[in-house]
Structures are given as structure tokens and as C-alpha cells.
């Protein structure tokens, strides 16, 4: 790839810089004509070159003139000023046309030999353009550093291509912006395999970059660290743009790179201050509080748009000053520096804080002179080394590890904060003394004590300081070694912050060495044969410390592997505990047993007693009467390993999949065999909770006995010694508990039936409903179905559906019926009917009440109110037809839950006169599918007519009203109320259609019966049915 030697070029550029003229001084123009004073003025000029080696020849190439005389061209003389001093031998003569302003050629040449700051301007004999002064820096640069380009403007905004990175285009929106303005970076890139690296674009200040690039390589890690903005390009091709806003003046380099040798740093832009600005400086210290003897890091930085001198970095306070950097050296000739590192050789210093009093100190950077002077400070406090906390246990158990900790204000040992290097100077030291002052532990003794195996006892009397200022001492088995006597001791801790021991602090604490604690705990002190006892030896000993456990009588646990000898040695865990489990022998004598725990060598022991008693058994059942197929819940408690279940008969009960056997068949003498016998194991709290199922088939109703045993030996029940419990259980058939249904239901209506059962197991049974009555014999109205989770069977009985779909009738006659609920086992279990219950139901004749307002004034509504005893919300087979001269409208009346409906007719546009309202309930038996259309055509059809059976309209209810529609309101209003009680039968010979025409309030009640009364035979049947129902109810 192509690389530009940017470092050398920029160095020359920033040492020789020309500032663009700006209007920021006192004078804005200078007169250069004496004949017409003030009419010919110079207001600006151009200077070249703007860089070069000393000696440097400059040229005032042209000046900007203004002639305000309207008629006369004017001439004058322009003189050169250097550092505010006129150079009389350096001038040019100029002439400007009248009333014009323009640039005119001048051509003053002057050679600069001084390497210090030089101010160049032009003017007359007594004044010059201070406000357009140019600042020119020069230096003794080697010839090779002088760029071979027309100007020293290194700015480059592209576009460029970086072929090695497969970036066809990379450019900047501008090569010079003011601080706070935005530079946009635009890039187009092609595919670049990620295994070859990640392409990045970084924006970095020149002050940092000149130390990042060395020849043909760059330091990628430092570049990423110093980057002001870093962009990562994806593997696939693409394009994008990014904005960067410089916050400090200076040159910025845009570097595209993938590693230390594949990069491009051609793009450069400059950020200039919006006005003349002094340098930006900062200084920092590594910590705000530092102890005497420790080190502190001072870091300083400077950002500037021009080289600066002098530069000083120092620490001061308590009338003491320590200079870290002073630039330039006395007598040295220099133009200034751009960074602290350039001026001082470094920008970070590690300084040891010593030989100074406690107090607050200041680290300071001070740069520049006059109006360009800038400074910054950082404050830190110097304190004496101090132990901030000391944690010594008030009591220490003899033989345990002794741990002593604390904190200090010292830096971490072995860090630059400690010693300026990796040498560890900050340390803490421990000495332990008895009350007489004798040292029982120190740095020397810690290396001289050995245990019984010849190994050195681990301990430390010297501790390094951690990053949080903490220290730690640990002495293994203290009390067993070093201080072997119980009593009080003094721990003395000293800290030291330097290698010479000049800065120290000491703290002491008293603690007591005590004997260990020992407890022996049993989870049960009363046990049964076959039980398990858990013993816990609880100590405050160190892990792996030795304890002994003694069993007074091995008969307690004979057969247990941990019960082979009377005394055993154990070692404590990390909590200082030992856990021992012993199984009580199934034939252990019923007595007390003693157990002892001991710490060897210290004379510390404790004991506990455990009593062996008979097993316990406490059993209860949730019910003693249960249907076949039902379950009995057994709860209680037992100390036995298992509770075994027997019965007085085989084949009646089951536990899970195991049948409960006849106890007599398992008994031989006083022993009962437990093979193939169901049992339940108590939980960890000795509780039992299980179910015993009653079989469905092969079981007769009656009373049976259940036997429960809690044996000490699970292989055999000893009736003489093992606890037992006997419970009597009565087995019944599943039964119907209650049938809930209304005793009276409207004609052709729906009603709810609910059957509550005691099914035993609801999955075993099913229920159906059967209806009997006039012309109906054992008709199934609800097929066999299972009960729900609450043991209910719920069904909606639809009389209209039963008549039409099950009996092929138009309707069930009003009268008395018997609804029977039957309960049986499912067919898979034999289908045996086990219970039934009857419910007497009366189907009522339908009652109609129609109210119509009359007379009605045109403009008011005709309101038809219908009230029935049909409590079927949503029933919509009632039609209302309003008929008059050349007028007919039919509407549908829909009942609410109270059996009521209202229909209204608007009268606007109707003629005054007499109208009739026909209200028809088709009973939903009309033969026509479109009942609305049929009623609209046959609204007048009398249910008693010969044509009515053709349309199955002979069971209809028809009410006819006559109303008067008036032009104007009368003095009174007549309300017509008609109540029609309808008793219907399946054979209709007469139907009364009620027509009422009134001028007064009239109430008419008509019973329209579809037949000539109940025949004698049917009356006898009805009476016989009532007697039969009454008998059945008494039987239940």
C-alpha cells in the first residue's frame, strides 16, 4: 500500500505555521496617502511563503487598497513592520483608481534570521495593521524535513482509495473546521474476509499519533487506546458515513487500518479555535489520599493549537515544592512544545511522598505566558501510615486456626503505589504475647514449630497489604501449638510503609484462648425397634479434628455396620460436626441406652440417653360407609417402617394394584405373613396418607373389617406385640342422593334437571333421565352419561324437542308426568342398575296476556305488550300483525327471561281509522320453515278451522285486538286487556280466537281448549298416575 511520511511532514507544518488574518485588533485600516489624508487606505495584505528554514525570506505579495476619492486616483507608500518595528528600507509604492477597492501588487521582501516568534504587518510611517498581524514560527529544521510542496498545508480531505483494505473511497467533508463543528467521514468498502482481520477507521489527534507511528508501522493497541472515535467495518461490502466533532484545537489524523503494517494515514483535518484560545491543560493524581512512604502518580497533558512555552509541572504545599518538569531549560532557545511529553520527556511521574508534614498538597501544571497562560491543579492529602481497623476474635478455641485481619491506609504491596516498582515495601507484622510480656508467636517462632508428623505448622507473622488496604495473619492449630495454655493473650500488629521503617503504626488487641465446645445431639430420644437414630457430634473444632463416639450397649443396634465396636474415632467436617446414623435392632430390648462423645486429650466429653419402646400406630378413615367402586382415605401416623393392611374377606378391597387379603388366610398362630400384602410407608415425619378402594364386581353390600398392623419386623406381624387397629366398613351400592327439577313447567318449554349422586368412583357410573305420562311410556329424555367432578348429572330438558324428535308429536299435552333418574354401573363394569328416583312434574297450559293502547293519535306509537308464563328468554315464535285499510305489517315478539315482550308500531304516514292487531304464538309447531312469511300471509287463520291442522297451526294461540287510530287526541284513552288461558291437547277440535273491540276499559279472560274436555278414560288414567307417583314418593 502507499503510505505518506506523515510524521516528518506534520512536524514541519506545526513548527512553521501561518495564521489567516482576522479582524481582532485595534486598527481596521491605515491611511497611506498624505495629499488626501484618510482617503487612500490599506486594509489587508498577503504573505508568502509561510514556512521554511532560517534564514527565511518572506514577500508581501499584494495589499488590499481602498480609494474613497470620487474623482482622483491616489498614490501612497506601504511600509513593512516586523514585531511592531517599521523597516524604513522595506516598502512599496501603490496607486489606486478613484472610488475603487481592490488588491494591488506590492512585492516587499524581507529575510528572517531569528528563530523566535515573529509578528509581520504593514502600515504607514507611524501606524500599522495590528488587527491583521500574522504570527510566523521558524526553526532550524534539517533540510530533509522541509516539504517539497508549494505550501505547508498538510490537510487532506480526500477522497482516497486504500486498495490493501479494499476500501475504494474514503473521504472527509472538510479539511478544516472550527472546534465544536462536525467533520463527516464517508466510506465505501468491498468484501474483506474476517479471518484476515477487522478493518477499522480511527480518528486520533496528531499529538498522540506522532508517537503511535514509527516508520512503516503503527502501534495498534495504543492507537485504539488514544482514538477519539473508532469505526469497525463489517466483512461484507457497504457504505456509510459518520460524524466526528472535535472538542480541542489541533490536527487530527484519520487512520484506516487492519494491523500494524496495513494502514493509511493520508486524511488529515485541522480544528481551529473560534477565537484566540489558550492551551487546554489537565493534571491528575492516582489517589486523593496517600500515606507517607507510599508513591503517587502525577499525570499531566496539554492540548494546543500552537507551540507553547514555558511549561512547568510540580507538587507544592507546606512551603515545599518538588519540580517534576521545567521547560525550557535556562538559556535554551526554543519555539515551544506541543505536548507535555515533548517538553518534559514524559507526561507521568511516580513520586514517593516522604519528608513532608501531613496536610493537603497540590499537583499543578502551568504553561504559557500572558493571555495564553493556562494552568490546572489536582489536590491530594498526605497522611501518616495508620491501622484503620484490627479484627481479633475475643475468644479463640484451642487448637483451631487463629485468623487476625485488619485494614490500613497503605497502598497494595509490590505496586508502583507502594514502591514505585514491583518491590514490596508495605507490610504488616504480628507478635502475640502472654500477659507477662513473653512473645509466644512472632516471625522467628513461626518457622520453628513442627507437628507430630514432623511437618512445619503453617503460620505467617508477616502480611502483605492488599489493594483494599487489608492484611491477614493465619496461624494453624493455635493453642495446640505456640500458646498451649488457656487464658488471655495480646496481639500486636505493626505496619510499615517503607523499606527503612521510618513510617509505622501499631495497634494491639486482647483475646482469650478457651477450651473447645462439645455437644451430642440425637434426633430422637425415644425410638422403636427398626427405627433409625441420627446422632450429631457438634463442636467448634477445625475440620478433620479427632473425636470419639462410644456405644454403651451394642444390643441397641446389633447388625448395623457402624455398631460393630463400642468405641470409634471420627473426624469433624468443615462445620465441626460428625453425623452418625444407627438402625435400632428389631429385637432390641425395650430399655434405655447411653451414648458418649469425647475430644481426645482435652478431657472433654458429653453423653445422651435413648429409650427403645414399642412401635406406635394411629389410624383413622374419612368414612366408614362407602359405595362399591369408592375409595376410603386412610390417614394417621406410625413409627414403623410400614403399615400392613388385611381384611375380613378377600376380593373386597384393593390398595393400588394390590388386593387386600383375608387376614385369616395369612395367620398362623400369633404370626401373620406379610408376603404379597399391601402396605404403606410413613413419610419422614411418620405420617401416612393413602387410599383403599372398594372393588366394583364380585362384592356384596354389607359390613367388612379392615385390619392395620405396624410390625417391628417387616417380614412378619406379631399379633402379640405389634400394634394394630381394626375398622368396620359398610359397603353399599352407588346411589342417587337428590333430583332437583321444577314441579311445574310451561307448555312446550325447557327446564333444568340436576341429579346429585354418591357414585363411589364417578368414573364407574352413569345416569339417564326417563319420562312417563299421558301418551308417553318410559321415554328416554337424556341418554346415559357420566357425572361431573362434583358428582352431578345436569341436563336441560326441552319439551318441544322431546315431542318432535323422540315422540313424533306436535307437543306434549299439559298434565302430570313422572321424570325418573336412573343410576347404573358402566357397561364395561356389567351395566348393573343400582338406583333410581322419581320426580313428579306438571306441564301447564299456556297463559297469554296482551295489552294494546287505544285509541292512538297519529304520530304516537302503537304499543303491544305481551305477557306469558313461558319463561324462555329468546323465544321468538310469537308474531304480531297490524292490519288496516291498505296496510299490513308483521313483527316478531321475542320474550325476555320473565316471559314478556313488547312490540311497537310507528303511526307516521298512516290513515285514521280502525285497525286490528293479530297476536299469534305458533308454539314452534308450524309446518312451514319460514314461519314469519307464513304468519304474514295467514295471520287470520283460526286455530279451530279445518285448515289449521294442515299447517300444524291447530295448537296456535291467537289473540285479536281492535284499535282506533285518530287524527286528534280524544278526551279519554281506552286500554284493552285480554287474558287468554290456553289448555292444549294433542287433538284439537275447537280453538277460540279472542277478538275484542272496546271503547271502555275491558278485561276478558277466555280459556281456549283444543278439544271438548278430558275423556273419561284419560281422566281415570291421570288419577291412577297420581296414585302411582304418590306411592313411589313414599317408597323413596
Curated annotation (Swiss-Prot):
It comes from Archaeoglobus fulgidus (strain ATCC 49558 / DSM 4304 / JCM 9628 / NBRC 100126 / VC-16). InterPro entries: PGF_CTERM (IPR026371). The chain crosses the membrane at residues 1011-1033. One of its GO terms (cellular component) is membrane. It comes from the Archaea. Its main location: membrane. It is a single-pass membrane protein. It holds the Pfam family PGF-CTERM. Keywords: Membrane, Signal, Transmembrane, Transmembrane helix. Residues 1-24 form the signal peptide. It is found in: Membrane. This is Uncharacterized protein AF_0946.
Amino acid at each position: 500500500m502507499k503510505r505518506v511520511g506523515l510524521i516528518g511532514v506534520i512536524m514541519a507544518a506545526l513548527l512553521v505555521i501561518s495564521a489567516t488574518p482576522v479582524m481582532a485588533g485595534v486598527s481596521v485600516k491605515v491611511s497611506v496617502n498624505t495629499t488626501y489624508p484618510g482617503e487612500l487606505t490599506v486594509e489587508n495584505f498577503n504573505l508568502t511563503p509561510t514556512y521554511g528554514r532560517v534564514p527565511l525570506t518572506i514577500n508581501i505579495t499584494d495589499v488590499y487598497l481602498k480609494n474613497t476619492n470620487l474623482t482622483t486616483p491616489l498614490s501612497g507608500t506601504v511600509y513593512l513592520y516586523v514585531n511592531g518595528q517599521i523597516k524604513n528600507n522595506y516598502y512599496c509604492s501603490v496607486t489606486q483608481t478613484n472610488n475603487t477597492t481592490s488588491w494591488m501588487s506590492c512585492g516587499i521582501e524581507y529575510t528572517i534570521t531569528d528563530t523566535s516568534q515573529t509578528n509581520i504587518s504593514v502600515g504607514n510611517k507611524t501606524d500599522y495593521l495590528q488587527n491583521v498581524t500574522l504570527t510566523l514560527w521558524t526553526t532550524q529544521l534539517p533540510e530533509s524535513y522541509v516539504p517539497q510542496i508549494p505550501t505547508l498545508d498538510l490537510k487532506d480531505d480526500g477522497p482516497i482509495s486504500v486498495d490493501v483494505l479494499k476500501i475504494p473511497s474514503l473521504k472527509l467533508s472538510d479539511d478544516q473546521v472550527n472546534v465544536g463543528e462536525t467533520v463527516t467521514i464517508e466510506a465505501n468498502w468491498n468484501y474483506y474476509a474476517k479471518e484476515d482481520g477487522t478493518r477499522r477507521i480511527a480518528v486520533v489527534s496528531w499529538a498522540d499519533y506522532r508517537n503511535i507511528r514509527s516508520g512503516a508501522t503503527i502501534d495498534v493497541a495504543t492507537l485504539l487506546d488514544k482514538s477519539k472515535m473508532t469505526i469497525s467495518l463489517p466483512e461484507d461490502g457497504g457504505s456509510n458515513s459518520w460524524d466526528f466533532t472535535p472538542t480541542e484545537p489541533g490536527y487530527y489524523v484519520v487512520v484506516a487500518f487492519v494491523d500494524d503494517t496495513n494502514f493509511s494515514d493520508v486524511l488529515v483535518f485541522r480544528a481551529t479555535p473560534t477565537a484566540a484560545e489558550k492551551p487546554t491543560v489537565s493534571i491528575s493524581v492516582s489517589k486523593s489520599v496517600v500515606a507517607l512512604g507510599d508513591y503517587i502518580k502525577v499525570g499531566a497533558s496539554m492540548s494546543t493549537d500552537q507551540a507553547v512555552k514555558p511549561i512547568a509541572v510540580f507538587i507544592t504545599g507546606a512551603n515545599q515544592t518538588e519540580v517534576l518538569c521545567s521547560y525550557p531549560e535556562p538559556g535554551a532557545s526554543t519555539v515551544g512544545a506541543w505536548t507535555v511529553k515533548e517538553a518534559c520527556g514524559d507526561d507521568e511521574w511516580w513520586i514517593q511522598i516522604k519528608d513532608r508534614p501531613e496536610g493537603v498538597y497540590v499537583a499543578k501544571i502551568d504553561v504559557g505566558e500572558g493571555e495564553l497562560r493556562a494552568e490546572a491543579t489536582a489536590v491530594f492529602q498526605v497522611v501518616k501510615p495508620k491501622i484503620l481497623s484490627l479484627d481479633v476474635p475475643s475468644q479463640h478455641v484451642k487448637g483451631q486456626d487463629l485468623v487476625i485481619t485488619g485494614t490500613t491506609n497503605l497502598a497494595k504491596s509490590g505496586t508502583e503505589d507502594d514502591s514505585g516498582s514491583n518491590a514490596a515495601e508495605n507490610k504488616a507484622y504480628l507478635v502475640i504475647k502472654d500477659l507477662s510480656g513473653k512473645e509466644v508467636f512472632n516471625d522467628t517462632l513461626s518457622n520453628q514449630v513442627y507437628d507430630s508428623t514432623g511437618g512445619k505448622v503453617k503460620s505467617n507473622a508477616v502480611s502483605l497489604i492488599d489493594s483494599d488496604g487489608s492484611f491477614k495473619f493465619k496461624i494453624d492449630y493455635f493453642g495446640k501449638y505456640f500458646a498451649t495454655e488457656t487464658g488471655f493473650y495480646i496481639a500486636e500488629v505493626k505496619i510499615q510503609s517503607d523499606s527503612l521503617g521510618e513510617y509505622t503504626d501499631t495497634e494491639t488487641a486482647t483475646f482469650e484462648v478457651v477450651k473447645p465446645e462439645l455437644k451430642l445431639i440425637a434426633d430422637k430420644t425415644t425410638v422403636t425397634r427398626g427405627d433409625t437414630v441420627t446422632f450429631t457430634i457438634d463442636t467448634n473444632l477445625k475440620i478433620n479434628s479427632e473425636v470419639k463416639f462410644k456405644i454403651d450397649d451394642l444390643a441397641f443396634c446389633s447388625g448395623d455396620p457402624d455398631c460393630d465396636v463400642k468405641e470409634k474415632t471420627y473426624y469433624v467436617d468443615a462445620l465441626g460436626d460428625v453425623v452418625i446414623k444407627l438402625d435400632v435392632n428389631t429385637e432390641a430390648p425395650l430399655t434405655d441406652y447411653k451414648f458418649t462423645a469425647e475430644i481426645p486429650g482435652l478431657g472433654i466429653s458429653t453423653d445422651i440417653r435413648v429409650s427403645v419402646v414399642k412401635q406406635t400406630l394411629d389410624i383413622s378413615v374419612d368414612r366408614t360407609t362407602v359405595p362399591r367402586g369408592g375409595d376410603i382415605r386412610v390417614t394417621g401416623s406410625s413409627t414403623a417402617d410400614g403399615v400392613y393392611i388385611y381384611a375380613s374377606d378377600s376380593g373386597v378391597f384393593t390398595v393400588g394394584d394390590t388386593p387386600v387379603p383375608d387376614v385369616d388366610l395369612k395367620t398362623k398362630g400369633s404370626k401373620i405373613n406379610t408376603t404379597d400384602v399391601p402396605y404403606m410407608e410413613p413419610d419422614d415425619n411418620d405420617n401416612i396418607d393413602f387410599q383403599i378402594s372398594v372393588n366394583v364386581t364380585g362384592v356384596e353390600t354389607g359390613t367388612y373389617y379392615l385390619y392395620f398392623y405396624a410390625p417391628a419386623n417387616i417380614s412378619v406381624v406379631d399379633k402379640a406385640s405389634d400394634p394394630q387397629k381394626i375398622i368396620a366398613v359398610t359397603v353399599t351400592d352407588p346411589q342417587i342422593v337428590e333430583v332437583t327439577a321444577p314441579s311445574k313447567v310451561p307448555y312446550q318449554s325447557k327446564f333444568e334437571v340436576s341429579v346429585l349422586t354418591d357414585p363411589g368412583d364417578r368414573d364407574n357410573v352413569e345416569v339417564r333421565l326417563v319420562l312417563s305420562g299421558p301418551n308417553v311410556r318410559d321415554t328416554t329424555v337424556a341418554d346415559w352419561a357420566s357425572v361431573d367432578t362434583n358428582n352431578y348429572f345436569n341436563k336441560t330438558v326441552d319439551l318441544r324437542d322431546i315431542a318432535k324428535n323422540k315422540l313424533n308429536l306436535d307437543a306434549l299435552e299439559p298434565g302430570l308426568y313422572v321424570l325418573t333418574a336412573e343410576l347404573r354401573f358402566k357397561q364395561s363394569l356389567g351395566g348393573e342398575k343400582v338406583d333410581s328416583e322419581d320426580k313428579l312434574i306438571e306441564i301447564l297450559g299456556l297463559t297469554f296476556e296482551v295489552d294494546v293502547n287505544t285509541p292512538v293519535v297519529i304520530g304516537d306509537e302503537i304499543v303491544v305488550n305481551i305477557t306469558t308464563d313461558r319463561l324462555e328468554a329468546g323465544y321468538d315464535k310469537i308474531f304480531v300483525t297490524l292490519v288496516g285499510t291498505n296496510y299490513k305489517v308483521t313483527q316478531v315478539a321475542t320474550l325476555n327471561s320473565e316471559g314478556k315482550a313488547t312490540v311497537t308500531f310507528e303511526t307516521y304516514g298512516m290513515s285514521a281509522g280502525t285497525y286490528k292487531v293479530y297476536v299469534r304464538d305458533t308454539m314452534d309447531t308450524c309446518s312451514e320453515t319460514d314461519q314469519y312469511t307464513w304468519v304474514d300471509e295467514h295471520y287470520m287463520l283460526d286455530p279451530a278451522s279445518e285448515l289449521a291442522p294442515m299447517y300444524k297451526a291447530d295448537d296456535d294461540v291467537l289473540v285479536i285486538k281492535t284499535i282506533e287510530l285518530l287524527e286528534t287526541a280524544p278526551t279519554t284513552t281506552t286500554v284493552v286487556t285480554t287474558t287468554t288461558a290456553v289448555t292444549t291437547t294433542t287433538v284439537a277440535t275447537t280453538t277460540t280466537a279472542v277478538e275484542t273491540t272496546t271503547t271502555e276499559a275491558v278485561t276478558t279472560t277466555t280459556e281456549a281448549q283444543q278439544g271438548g274436555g278430558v275423556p273419561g278414560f284419560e281422566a281415570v288414567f291421570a288419577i291412577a298416575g297420581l296414585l302411582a307417583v304418590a306411592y313411589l314418593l313414599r317408597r323413596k
